[in-house]
């Protein structure tokens, strides 16, 4: 609250400064008490105002915390783009693996069709003669149900 200046005036014809200052203080005191009576709130009003003030403070603090935890539009867009890129990469790798599986199956079928063991009914092992005359055994090992692998042993 701003402090009000005390009334300082000297009435005409009075030379007694002490009495004049006492009168000024009395008048100033009366003015102050009257002002306080007008400004003074009831207990109910004071409690209500205090509750409103605390609620506003609480709302401000919770808004600050929410603002800190909330992602901005740029951050949201960035994370959506990351997710989109991740999905595209997964699709690309899935297609790559499908293509490689197809190539593998094609080579496997070619090897099986050339194999003399085809008639004996052994699809797991293959033998073939190379130019140097050595015999190699090709063994199919299924490590993953979706991707069998060829292992060549001499």
Swiss-Prot record:
Record-linked InterPro entries: FAM192A/Fyv6_N
Pfam families: FAM192A_Fyv6_N
Annotated segments matching region Disordered: 1-30, 48-68, 98-154
Protein family: Belongs to the FYV6 family.
Compartment(s) where it occurs, according to its Swiss-Prot or TrEMBL record: Nucleus; Chromosome, Telomere
Keyword RNA-binding: no
Main location: nucleus
Bias (Basic and acidic residues): 16-26, 58-68, 98-108
Ranges of biased composition (kind: Basic residues): 140-154
Superkingdom per UniProt: Eukaryota
Biased composition (Polar residues): 125-135
UniProt KW Protease keyword: no
Key words of the record: Chromosome, Nucleus, Telomere
GO CC field: chromosome, telomeric region; nucleus
Record-given protein name: Protein FYV6
Record's function text: Involved in telomere length regulation and promotes fully efficient non-homologous end-joining (NHEJ) by a mechanism activated in postdiauxic/stationary phase.
């Amino acid at each position: 609250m701003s402090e009000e200046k005390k009334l300082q005036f000297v009435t005409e014809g009075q030379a007694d400064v002490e009495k004049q200052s006492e009168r000024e203080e009395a008048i100033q005191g009366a003015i102050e008490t009257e002002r306080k009576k007008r400004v003074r709130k009831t207990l109910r009003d004071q409690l209500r105002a205090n509750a409103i003030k605390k609620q506003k403070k609480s709302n401000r603090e919770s808004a600050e915390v929410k603002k800190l935890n909330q992602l901005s539009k740029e951050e949201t867009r960035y994370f959506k783009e990351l997710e989109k890129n991740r999905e595209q990469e997964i699709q690309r790798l899935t297609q790559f693996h499908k293509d490689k599986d197809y190539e593998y199956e094609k080579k496997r079928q070619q090897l099986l069709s050339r194999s003399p063991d085809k008639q004996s009914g052994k699809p797991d092992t293959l033998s073939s003669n190379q130019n140097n005359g050595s015999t190699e055994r090709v063994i199919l090992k299924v490590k993953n149900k979706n991707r069998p692998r060829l292992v060549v042993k001499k």
